[in-house]
């Protein structure tokens, strides 16, 4: 396992190598790594896109305040969106997928918003998409929400068992 950015020392257990997947590519790390530290060690710099303009974003901090590294964790039917890469402990077989991109993180078609940024001022959608009124809930709002970049739930049955349920 070649990790160009891996430093000597640290609080990881180098005797326990782990493998994980990020956006369909397999990488390696060690027990005690976070997803962020393993990605940085493997030379992965691009982990997300900005919400409005879809500009490329990388990891800039090591704590829970990290704004750029939101991923979706998958395990069978379970999907956990909006997980922070700096707070996700690495485990063998971890599957993480970046969010807020279409079709891929490296080539995001929504990045055209960056080129149109002069025309997309704050709250532009409240002024622009007012007519016809019936289009707001059925057309405009779903498109804007999809472009906003937060994760989506799986839609499959929750495999967990709970003591109580509320509806």
Where is each model-derived feature located?
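Short, structural beta-strand-to-alpha-helix junction motif
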Residues: 34-36
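Fe-S ferredoxin-like electron-transfer domains
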Residues: 51-167
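Carbohydrate-associated surface elements
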Residues: 39
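Ubiquitin-like/PB1-type beta-grasp interaction modules and other compact soluble beta-rich domains
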Residues: 1-18, 22-31, 42-81
């Amino acid at each position: 396992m070649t990790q160009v950015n891996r430093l000597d020392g640290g609080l990881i257990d180098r005797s326990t190598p782990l493998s994980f997947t990020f956006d369909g590519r397999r990488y390696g790390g060690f027990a005690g790594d976070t997803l962020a530290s393993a990605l940085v060690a493997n030379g992965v710099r691009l982990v997300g896109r900005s919400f409005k303009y879809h500009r490329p974003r990388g990891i800039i901090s090591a704590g829970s305040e990290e704004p750029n590294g939101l991923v979706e964790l998958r395990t069978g039917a379970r999907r956990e969106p909006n997980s922070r890469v700096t707070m996700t402990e690495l485990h063998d077989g971890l599957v993480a997928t970046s969010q807020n991109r279409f079709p891929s993180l490296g080539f995001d078609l929504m990045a055209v918003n960056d080129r149109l940024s002069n025309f997309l001022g704050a709250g532009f959608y409240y002024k622009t998409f007012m007519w016809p009124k019936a289009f707001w809930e059925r057309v405009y709002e779903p498109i804007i929400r999809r472009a906003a970049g937060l994760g989506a739930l799986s839609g499959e049955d929750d495999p967990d068992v709970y003591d109580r349920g509320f509806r």
